[in-house]
Regions:
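Compositionally biased, low-complexity segments enriched in small residues
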Residues: 2, 7-8, 30-33, 55
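Short basic helix-loop element that most often maps to the first helix and adjoining turn
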Residues: 5-24, 49
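Short, charged recognition helix plus adjacent turn
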Residues: 9-10, 34, 60-68
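Recognition helix of helix-turn-helix/homeodomain-like DNA-binding domains
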Residues: 26-42
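Non-catalytic, surface-exposed connector residues within folded enzymatic/regulatory domains
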Residues: 1, 15, 41-44
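DNA major-groove recognition helix of helix-turn-helix/homeodomain DNA-binding modules
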Residues: 26, 45-60
């Protein structure tokens, strides 16, 4: 599963809208959409904020890349 799909899946699992997540990590909702759709990738500080807000492990996001 791609990183963007994992972000979307976890966000919806937590019942968060893109706007709510964006407000929590201080980015725009369109940025969240871009991350989820693989259009762009978050900067390191934003990635850390996403990991904390979504309560996920960084290894979960990158496990497909680490095992290949």
């Amino acid at each position: 599963m791609e990183i963007g799909n994992k972000l979307r899946s976890r966000r919806t699992e937590l019942g968060l809208s893109r706007i709510e997540l964006a407000e929590q990590i201080h980015v725009t909702a369109s940025s969240i959409s871009n991350y989820e759709n693989g259009i762009s990738y978050p900067k390191p500080d934003t990635l850390i904020a996403l990991i904390l807000a979504l309560k996920i492990d960084a290894n979960y996001l990158y496990q497909d890349y680490l095992t290949n």
